[in-house]
Curated annotation (Swiss-Prot):
Its EC number is 1.1.1.267. Pathway: Isoprenoid biosynthesis; isopentenyl diphosphate biosynthesis via DXP pathway; isopentenyl diphosphate from 1-deoxy-D-xylulose 5-phosphate: step 1/6. One of its GO terms (biological process) is isopentenyl diphosphate biosynthetic process, methylerythritol 4-phosphate pathway involved in terpenoid biosynthetic process. Catalyzes the NADPH-dependent rearrangement and reduction of 1-deoxy-D-xylulose-5-phosphate (DXP) to 2-C-methyl-D-erythritol 4-phosphate (MEP). The keyword Manganese applies. This is 1-deoxy-D-xylulose 5-phosphate reductoisomerase. 1-deoxy-D-xylulose 5-phosphate binds at K121, S147, E148, S172, H195, S208, N213, K214, E217. The gene is dxr. It comes from Leptospira biflexa serovar Patoc (strain Patoc 1 / ATCC 23582 / Paris). SUPFAM superfamilies: 1-deoxy-D-xylulose-5-phosphate reductoisomerase, C-terminal domain, Glyceraldehyde-3-phosphate dehydrogenase-like, C-terminal domain, NAD(P)-binding Rossmann-fold domains.
Length: 386
């Protein structure tokens, strides 16, 4: 029986993780989890799984629900996430919280020797060199949960590294893949949140609509697998059935395909290095009638090019890209800027903020905060057309 901690259990990845835990009750035991503010979800899961500790991170809710419920201890605030992952009973940590708040508990889990099922891409994008040094130092196992990276993880394990010429991340194309370019300036938040394939949170759905999510995943793939940016490609695949592709030196391509359901990569990350037992959800290839692949339109998706630019620059540039995007997407979701202003703000940040090569966590965090301040200042001063 493996103890599991899930950071961000009420989100889409967390919800899918619970499905896997229910399917394999003899293999996994939910020992701790966090929610931001959804007490109803937390209460129901405490009643179902009886974890040792839970955490509510919303600062407005500190103390509201007491210090325990049934036999489960209740903690509050982002700092308490570290307590969840350090429990002796926890063997694997699923990091599914959004944004930079995932980095400190991830570092704590690495230093505690826990297996990491990482779904918080911002941790690797912003702090990639630091995280990789810690993983090597503590001999930690880190398995990606994102469907594309998990697919590549499995494909790369089956092939000799010297035989792999390139890796490819697939993308659905998001909510606006077929929308006329001139209409992008005027799309609404509601339109952006209407993803054709996946059910995800608002921020990641907006990222997907502009392929910025895929840009973040390109940077993440670089740090996870060690491929150069020239060896990492992106293709539009509207069916979302093929999740990852590797091209071998003999000219062949190996594809990982599955029904678009997050339970597959989550189950793999929990069971790894052991094989995943037969899942209750099955899909037959005979139901996959069409596979389409085509290159992304960089006029439609300028954020993807900016991600490659930031990744190749290295240092704090990927973190600048990520922080600028987080702030810009928040402004869009509040209907304060247009959809096409998001990449313009990111480009402005990359051009105006000095890139550095931090050696410490604080160095990365300082540049992250500088970027967020810059975006807010640009918006408040009207520095970028909205």
């Amino acid at each position: 029986m493996v103890g599991v901690s899930v950071l961000g259990i009420s989100g889409s990845v967390g919800t899918s993780t619970v499905k896997v835990l229910r399917q394999f009750p003899d293999q996994f035991d939910l020992r701790s989890f966090s929610v931001h503010s959804n007490w109803n979800v937390a209460k129901a899961l405490v009643e179902e799984f009886s974890p040792e500790v839970i955490c509510i991170t919303d600062p407005k809710l500190v103390g509201k629900f007491g210090d325990s419920y049934l036999s489960t201890k209740i903690l509050y605030g982002d700092k308490a996430l570290i307590d969840l992952v350090q429990l002796p009973s926890v063997g694997v940590v699923v990091t599914a919280v959004m944004g930079a708040r995932g980095v400190l508990p991830t570092i704590a889990a690495i230093e505690a020797g826990k297996k990491i099922a990482i779904a918080n891409k911002e941790t690797l994008v912003t702090f990639g060199p630091l995280i990789n040094r810690l993983v090597a130092k503590h001999n930690t196992v880190m398995v990606p949960v994102d469907s594309e990276h998990n697919a590549l993880f499995q494909l790369i394990e089956r092939e000799t590294r010297s035989n792999i010429r390139a890796i490819t991340l697939t993308a659905s194309g998001g909510s606006f893949r077929t929308l006329p370019l001139e209409a992008l300036e005027h799309v609404s938040v509601k339109q952006a949140l209407n993803h054709p394939t996946w059910s995800m949170g608002p921020k990641i759905t907006v990222d997907s609509a502009g392929l910025i999510n895929k840009g973040l995943e390109v940077i993440e793939a670089h740090f996870l697998f060690g491929f150069s940016y020239d060896e990492i490609e992106v293709v539009i695949h509207p069916q979302s059935i093929t999740h990852g592709i590797i091209e071998t030196t003999d000219g062949a391509c190996l594809l990982y395909a599955s029904h678009p359901d997050m339970v597959y990569p989550i189950a793999h990350s929990l069971f790894y290095p052991n094989p995943t037992p037969q899942m209750l959800i099955e899909r037959k290839p005979s139901t996959w009638n069409t596979f389409e692949f085509f290159p992304p339109d960089t006029k439609r998706y300028p954020g993807l090019l900016l991600a490659y630019q930031a990744g190749k620059a290295g240092g704090a540039a990927p973190g600048i890209f990520n922080a600028a995007n987080e702030e810009a997407v928040a402004l869009f979701l509040e209907e304060k800027i247009s959809f096409t202003t998001i990449p313009r703000l990111i480009e402005s940040a990359l051009n105006q903020i000095e890139n550095v090569f931090p050696e410490t966590l604080d160095g990365y965090l300082e540049k992250d905060q500088e970027t967020r301040n810059y975006i807010q200042r640009e918006f408040n001063q009207g520095g970028v057309t909205t």
